Amino acid sequence: MATLLLLLGVLVVSPDALGSTTAVQTPTSGEPLVSTSEPLSSKMYTTSITSDPKADSTGDQTSALPPSTSINEGSPLWTSIGASTGSPLPEPTTYQEVSIKMSSVPQETPHATSHPAVPITANSLGSHTVTGGTITTNSPETSSRTSGAPVTTAASSLETSRGTSGPPLTMATVSLETSKGTSGPPVTMATDSLETSTGTTGPPVTMTTGSLEPSSGASGPQVSSVKLSTMMSPTTSTNASTVPFRNPDENSRGMLPVAVLVALLAVIVLVALLLLWRRRQKRRTGALVLSRGGKRNGVVDAWAGPAQVPEEGAVTVTVGGSGGDKGSGFPDGEGSSRRPTLTTFFGRRKSRQGSLAMEELKSGSGPSLKGEEEPLVASEDGAVDAPAPDEPEGGDGAAP
């Protein structure tokens, strides 16, 4: 919490003393302020206010306190926030302007004799306490004597606080009262204490107007209205960004269906590729099986062929032998040339065997064959008989 600077001054015009100076003290928070009624010089204090009363001044008056800290009754009265004190005020600087409208009733002074300038003395003030962020100020009372224009002014207190959170400090109402006087325009001016708060959070600054209680006097104008105009720096506030915020759960829920669809598509593509590959493999294996089956059959046929070749060869040989040297019958060359036919399918081989049988029957039924068979038999017998005598010869030769 920033430093609290309170500026409080009271000006009282008394007809019994000469014009002098009164001091404006700046009390610290938590310490009571007591001002004694004695003339003080401006050397002892940092801020001094001088006033010269004019008993004959009439008409509307607007009082203001300029920052020069010296005023006259007819000059505008300015309450300067941030007058020269021991410690400077923190930024932002806030000014409070108090303007008082006086009624148009002319001021009447019952005494014809003029009085010399009276000193301005400060009356006793109540204690000023600060408790829990609330400023309370007891209402001081001033008294005027017989004549003159008693003017009571109370300088407003300034309180500036800077914080980030929490409500600002509340303000106390400053009320001044003037006692009854015989003559002169009793004027009571009260300026409300101003409080500004700069922060990011918390309610704005609240202000209460000071109460004015003019005393009853014989004559003289009285305060009709008080205008309180305050210039404050605006409080800073943080605006939320307009970008919509998405919950991560909603994002995950939105992404879940997309992930499921992608997974399903990937599975479908993989299954389709697997089926195509399997079908292609089946086609390749079927062609291989068919080709292998043909080869196996060919191998079996080729193996069966050579196994049956000697039998058919023997038949052909016998037929050729039966034909003899005459050339009737099938020569060996034809048999050898017909061997490749035996390596074909069984049907063709059977048909070939049938044709051979028919040829044998035809050759056997022909008369020429019978005539020819006889010499063949005879020749065979001769051939058989021929070595028979050799055997005895051999035997005979072997015997001796």
From Swiss-Prot:
Keyword line: Cell projection, Glycoprotein, Membrane, Nucleus, Phosphoprotein, Signal, Transmembrane, Transmembrane helix, Ubl conjugation
Bias kind Low complexity: ranges: 196-211
Ranges in the topological domain labelled Cytoplasmic: 277-400
Chain ranges on the Extracellular side, renumbered to this chain: 20-253
Residues annotated with Phosphoserine modification: S291, S336, S351, S355, S368, S379
Tissues expressed in: Cell surface of thymocytes, T-lymphocytes, neutrophils, plasma cells and myelomas.
Region (Disordered): 21-224, 320-400
Cystine pairings recorded for this chain: none
One Gene Ontology cellular component: microvillus
Transmembrane segments: 254-276
Post-translational modification Phosphothreonine, affected residues: T341
Glycosylation sites (chain numbering): 21-22, 26, 28-29, 35-37, 41-42, 46-48, 50, 58, 69, 99, 103, 109, 113-114, 136-137, 173, 178, 239
Bias (Polar residues) ranges: 21-51, 58-112, 121-164, 172-182, 212-224
Bilayer topology: Single-pass type I membrane protein
Post-translational modification: Glycosylated; has a high content of sialic acid and O-linked carbohydrate structures. Phosphorylation at Ser-355 is regulated by chemokines, requires its association with ERM proteins (EZR, RDX and MSN) and is essential for its function in the regulation of T-cell trafficking to lymph nodes.
Signal peptide boundaries: 1-19
GO-annotated biological processes: apoptotic signaling pathway; cell surface receptor signaling pathway; cellular defense response; chemotaxis; defense response to bacterium; establishment or maintenance of cell polarity; immune response; leukocyte tethering or rolling
Placement of sequence motif Nuclear localization signal: 282-296
Region ranges (Required for interaction with EZR, MSN and RDX and for co-localization to microvilli): 278-308
Purpose of the protein: Predominant cell surface sialoprotein of leukocytes which regulates multiple T-cell functions, including T-cell activation, proliferation, differentiation, trafficking and migration. Positively regulates T-cell trafficking to lymph-nodes via its association with ERM proteins (EZR, RDX and MSN). Negatively regulates Th2 cell differentiation and predisposes the differentiation of T-cells towards a Th1 lineage commitment.
Protein name (database record): Leukosialin
Originating organism: Homo sapiens
Highest classification ranks of the organism: Eukaryota, Metazoa, Chordata, Craniata, Vertebrata
